UniProtKB/Swiss-Prot annotation:
SMART domains for this protein: WD40
Entry annotated with the keyword Ribosomal protein: no
The protein, known as: WD repeat domain-containing protein 83 homolog
Disulphide-bonded residues: none
Principal cellular location given in the protein's record: cytoplasm
Record Pfam families: WD40
Localization of this protein: Cytoplasm
Region (Disordered) location: 157-179
Native organism taxonomy: Eukaryota, Amoebozoa, Evosea, Eumycetozoa, Dictyostelia
Cellular component aspect of the GO annotation: catalytic step 2 spliceosome; cytoplasm
SUPFAM superfamilies linked: WD40 repeat-like
Amino acid sequence: MVKISCNKVLSNHSGSVTVVKYNSDGGYCLSGSSDKSIKLYNVSKGSMIHSFEEHGYGIGDLVSTSDNKQLFSCAEKQLYQWDIASGQVIRRFQNAHNDTITSVCVNLDSTLLFSGSSDRLVKAWDLRTKSINPVQILDDAKDTITSIIVNEQTITHNHSHGHGHSHGNNNNNQPHTHTQKEVITSSVDGCIRTYDVRMGTLVTYEDTIPISSVSITKDKKCFIASCTDETVKLIDIDSYETLKEYKGHKNKVYKINSCSNFDDSLIISGSEDNDFYIYELLSGKLLSKLSGHSNIITHVDSHPSKNQFITSSTDCTIRIWDQSE
């Protein structure tokens, strides 16, 4: 049995905390709030390092780059790129969308930024140029985009079984690798859409229940979808079969997210009943329902290499939860 308890409460925001995310190694976390600020914390110390205060509206989403040097954030129709060390805005994408921007995501090498909006569009921005226009627009969703993931992994094809003919060399025994790049979106229209950037294809998981967020397991084999029928669904990434449903938390109105822990043994979820829910991934069993927040838990995130979690709430606080020894 995994015992989890809250060991730190961060109370630096003066408004609802809409999002909280670890940086790539889990040493720091970033939060966004309706108070229009983004805050950077040292997780182990529980201390705030910096407050980013250039947005004119409440923060909808944020993401840091894999090298932890830059930050992207959205607020209403504003899309900003920040230098984390200096706290300065590097670039403003003014009026990037025609409606509120709900989600942002950046690829691994920080060359492409993706933004999703209530205008139903996903836009891709080339960070290597100063162009004010997106390089691509994905317009397949029928309703608000609720989350975006970039899934990049190296696929190895082993040709040692003698497929094809050898043309005077022996290279067909060498494994061939390519990087699969997928952009995955969820929407209020009940669909998860997977775009293969390399192949230019789209595959759609369709349901009638609005999806308030989608994440991906650490082994990249399953989607984790938070749905407004108060379920979290574990969906096979290849067959789109629903493998497991997790029930107990409350989610009918708000954008609430879920994700797996570092080793894919647990599923964690926010909830509208103010409690933090932890499920066993394989069995679907509810392991823990943790109290502490005094209002809706809007966002949860899992440390990349241990059982530590962060939660944000409309009670204006962030809580850090650790596994008890």
